[in-house]
Amino acid sequence: MFQKTDFLSKIFSSSSHPLTGSQNIVVKDPQTLDFAMQSQNEIVCSLRERSHMNTMSYAQTQMMAIDEIRAFQSEGHLHLKYISLIIAMMAETAVVTSRSWFPYFSCPSKSQRLAEAEGRILSALGIKYLARLIQIPFKNTEISTITVNCESEQPIVKAKYPIVLIHGFGAGVALWGSAIKRLAQFQTVHAFDLPGFGRSSRPKFSSDPETAETEMIDSIEQWRDKMNLEKMNLVGHSFGGYLATSYALKYPKRVENLILADPWGFNEMDPEFAQKLTSRQKNIFWVIQQFNPLAVLRLVGGYGPSLVRRLRPDLALKYSEDVYDYIYLANSRDPTGEEVFKCLSENLGWAKQPMSKRFHELDNTVPVTFIHGERSWIDWRTTRRLFGELEHVESHIMDSAGHHVYADDADKFVQLVIGSLKDGKTGELVPEEVNLEEEIVTPI
């Protein structure tokens, strides 16, 4: 049995931090101390049961976490419930890196629950779809894919090539929601879970940023080949937009149109942002960056859906209640996709290799459309200033949307997507005056 003194005694053992001189952590609230001891004990025991982690590896993890806690701890006070969480998250990151436990998601019933939650979300929206696993050569990875065929007898404009959707960080195919239904009025739609996310396999990617990015986009190309798609109208959201752009840079002949929905990773970090940070804030941010982004969601276990509901109560307005189970279950597996994102990012989510430095290399025969949410945390103003004047680039701002443009206003989003696609017969753009709200009446 893991004893609470194994780490608490280390926290209180010395009078000051060897580097910072910070005094011992003082806890005046007995309830906070009891909570910390109990929660830390439960979390670590759970980790040990699942991972069979060796003592030395975990001891090193403890000391690293404790050192960092002391480094940014100020005025001698820090709630131990946060210490418990930090140590547990650091432990998860350490054992995932060494792959001493696998898989996170060993229970078949949970895998089935994820598939069922996905099905209920899509069915509640009246979407008829084909679900399948497409195996690609990269480490025999299986890519979870759904296809929605165009069933409209007389679509307003029939796009020449299928529409392919690439989701963002921590998401999956089901979150495209009603946008899939509307897009399928014009062309067959394929949506897939990126490797390392959703229901797809969890292959181990390289820890080198350039190699990891290449592995991810080559996986997309292998998926396209297995799907027998000559070209694609490629739509990527957030992190998916970053990967879609990277894919188009390497495989421009396979992209008919590139539509970027509030893409992540385009702008360089604002130097003024870093300059404004205090030393304490920099230390805190450094600690946070050592964790897998969604580690806390896994650490809370069965409370995951409730945590998602508390953080995003608005999701119930766009999807069925199953969305909370879906997000939790989709991110309960070995987080290899998260590790790729973590590998490609720095300084709290800025891309190490921002697309602003590479976008000029994109073949200018590939039409690009940016669709941003006015209320998004993404800096769309800089993106628009950098690329808005290029002849092959269009930029749209949805004043009714935040970061999740496809869900915040699905009708407007689809109108902009379809308006950017070339007519397969004439090569002309779909007229902007097409009113999708009036035209889309046939349920799928």
UniProtKB/Swiss-Prot annotation:
This is Abhydrolase domain-containing protein abhd-5.2. It is found in: Lipid droplet. Residues 162-409 form the AB hydrolase-1 domain. Acts coordinately with phospholipase atgl-1 within the lipolytic cascade to distribute stored energy to tissues to maintain energy levels during the dauer phase. Localizes atgl-1 to lipid droplets, possibly to facilitate triglyceride hydrolysis. Regulates lipid droplet size, lipid content, the exchange of lipids between lipid droplets and fusion of lipid droplets during the dauer phase. It holds the Pfam family Abhydrolase_1. GO terms for molecular function: carboxylic ester hydrolase activity; lysophosphatidic acid acyltransferase activity. Belongs to the peptidase S33 family. ABHD4/ABHD5 subfamily. SUPFAM superfamilies: alpha/beta-Hydrolases (SSF53474). One of its GO terms (biological process) is lipid homeostasis.
